[in-house]
Every structure is written in C-alpha cells, then in structure tokens.
C-alpha cells in the first residue's frame, strides 16, 4: 500500500490506465477474431472487407498511440492483409 498521498493518486491513475489499455487490446483481438470467423464461415467478400478495414484501422490507431508496439501493429496488419488477399483470390 502506498504511504504517501501522491503515491495513492499514482496507484489510482495506474489502475484506470491499465483497465483502459486492456479494454483497447481486447477490442482489437475481438476485431481480428471476427474477421477470421467470417473467413472461416465463407462470408460475403464485402463483410470480410469491412471487418478487415476496421481491424486495420484499430491496429493503426493503437500502434501510433503506443498501446502496442508499432512493429507489432505493422506485423499484424501484414498478416491480416495476406489473409484477406488469400480469401479475396479464392472468391
């Protein structure tokens, strides 16, 4: 337990930020999983494309704001793009 008033405040801030960061990362994982499920279900290309766009947009935002490392965001975008392009060619 913090002994100083400022340390108590820092603890509260840290807990709030941690919860916010976890929520953002969880939202990203959900978007990626939704895209993968649509591909597995052989959904319409337009549905998969909208899921792809939202996932890439979220990756860009989290990478720029350092919620995830920029290189990780780039790597995930590349993986999703390959997955989407493979699906689009198969259609």
From Swiss-Prot:
Biased composition regions of type Basic and acidic residues, renumbered to the chain? 1-18
Gene Ontology MF term list: small ribosomal subunit rRNA binding; structural constituent of ribosome
Q: One Pfam family for this entry, by name?
A: Ribosomal_S20p
Query: Taxonomically, which superkingdom?
Result: Bacteria
Keyword flag RNA-binding: yes
User: Sorted alphabetically, which InterPro entries does this protein's record hold?
Assistant: Ribosomal_bS20, Ribosomal_bS20_sf
What keywords does the record list, in alphabetical order?
Ribonucleoprotein, Ribosomal protein, RNA-binding, rRNA-binding
Choose any GO biological process term that the UniProt entry carries and state it. Answer: translation
- Region listing for Disordered, in residue ranges: 1-25
GO cellular component, alphabetical, reads: cytosol; small ribosomal subunit
User: Which sequence ranges form a coiled-coil region, renumbered to this chain?
Assistant: none
Protein family (similarity comment): Belongs to the bacterial ribosomal protein bS20 family.
Q: Which PANTHER family match?
A: 30S RIBOSOMAL PROTEIN S20, SMALL RIBOSOMAL SUBUNIT PROTEIN BS20C
Q: Please explain the role this protein plays, according to its UniProt record.
A: Binds directly to 16S ribosomal RNA.
Recorded protein name is Small ribosomal subunit protein bS20
């Amino acid at each position: 337990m913090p002994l100083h008033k400022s340390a108590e405040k820092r603890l509260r801030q840290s807990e709030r930020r941690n919860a916010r960061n976890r929520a953002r990362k969880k939202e990203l994982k959900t978007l990626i999983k939704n895209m993968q499920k649509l591909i597995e279900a052989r959904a319409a290309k337009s549905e998969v494309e909208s899921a792809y766009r939202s996932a890439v947009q979220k990756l860009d935002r989290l990478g720029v704001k350092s919620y995830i490392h920029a290189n990780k965001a780039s790597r995930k975008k590349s993986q999703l793009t390959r997955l989407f392009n493979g699906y689009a060619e198969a259609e």
